[in-house]
Amino acid sequence: MIGQLMNLKATELCLGLPGGAEAVESPAKSAVGSKRGFSETVDLMLNLQSNKEGSVDLKNVSAVPKEKTTLKDPSKPPAKAQVVGWPPVRNYRKNMMTQQKTSSGAEEASSEKAGNFGGGAAGAGLVKVSMDGAPYLRKVDLKMYKSYQDLSDALAKMFSSFTMGNYGAQGMIDFMNESKLMNLLNSSEYVPSYEDKDGDWMLVGDVPWEMFVESCKRLRIMKGSEAVGLAPRAMEKYCKNRS
């Protein structure tokens, strides 16, 4: 029965061109197929784009930490530009050498200042004092004294066993008295002399005190017999300086 119906349907007459039924059915099938093909192509394109985006992100993510590690990696050796000299010496060693030189220079300068009692003015007044027959030297600061009287008292205390004689301490006080000077020069007593800026030796007391302090470089207490030639030359030089 079913077979007869199918045969009847197949032989049934209908309006339209031959093969129309197949043509009507085929568009639906083609539409369905086209829909499936479009959806598949869209899905494929989306998958490809997502894969591309994911790959780019991975590259960026992997590249960023590399840059950070290169910048902040403390374990890497320093660049070759930091090595100087041969054998290679690093910059910090070179800097330490310069610092040591500057510190040594500062220490030398401070020691010189300490030797000069902390200043140029005080160092200019500091002179050595020697005495013939004395096994030691002394230093006096001429700026601490205001006159020949004060200086003679200080020298008498320093070399008391040598300066005390027939004249006692008076032989070193009145330097400007010519008669006493000549008596000292003709005797065996000790008289004080000094070396001026020109390198000449003169008797202490032949020039005013201020000039003596400025020109004195060294003091020497010598025997009067050895200082005979100093008195006339000292007076002559003082007269030339005044003129």
UniProtKB/Swiss-Prot annotation:
Broad class of where this protein is predominantly found: nucleus
Tissue: Highly expressed in stems and flowers.
Outcome reported for the amino acid change (mutating residue 87 to S): In axr2-1; gain of function. Affects auxin-related developmental processes. Affects photomorphogenesis
Keyword Transcription: yes
The organism's place on the tree of life at top rank: Eukaryota
Matches recorded under Gene3D superfamilies: Phosphatidylinositol 3-kinase Catalytic Subunit, Chain A, domain 1 (3.10.20.90)
GO molecular function: DNA-binding transcription factor activity; transcription cis-regulatory region binding
Renumbered ranges of motif EAR-like (transcriptional repression): 13-17
Pfam families: AUX_IAA
Matching PROSITE patterns: PB1
Keyword Transcription in record: yes
Swiss-Prot/TrEMBL keywords: Auxin signaling pathway, Nucleus, Repressor, Transcription, Transcription regulation
Compartments in which it is found: Nucleus
GO terms under biological process: auxin-activated signaling pathway; gravitropism; response to auxin; response to jasmonic acid; response to water deprivation; response to wounding
Induction data: By auxin.
Entry domain remark: The N-terminal half of the protein contains two conserved domains I and II. Domain I includes a slightly degenerated ERF-associated amphiphilic repression (EAR) motif which seems to be involved in the activity of transcriptional repression. Domain II is required for the correct degradation of the protein through the SCF-mediated ubiquitin-proteasome pathway. Interactions between Aux/IAA proteins and auxin response factors (ARFs) occur through their C-terminal dimerization domains III and IV.
Reported function: Aux/IAA proteins are short-lived transcriptional factors that function as repressors of early auxin response genes at low auxin concentrations. Repression is thought to result from the interaction with auxin response factors (ARFs), proteins that bind to the auxin-responsive promoter element (AuxRE). Formation of heterodimers with ARF proteins may alter their ability to modulate early auxin response genes expression.
Subunit architecture: Homodimers and heterodimers.
Family per similarity comment: Belongs to the Aux/IAA family.
Stated name of the protein: Auxin-responsive protein IAA7
Species annotation: Arabidopsis thaliana
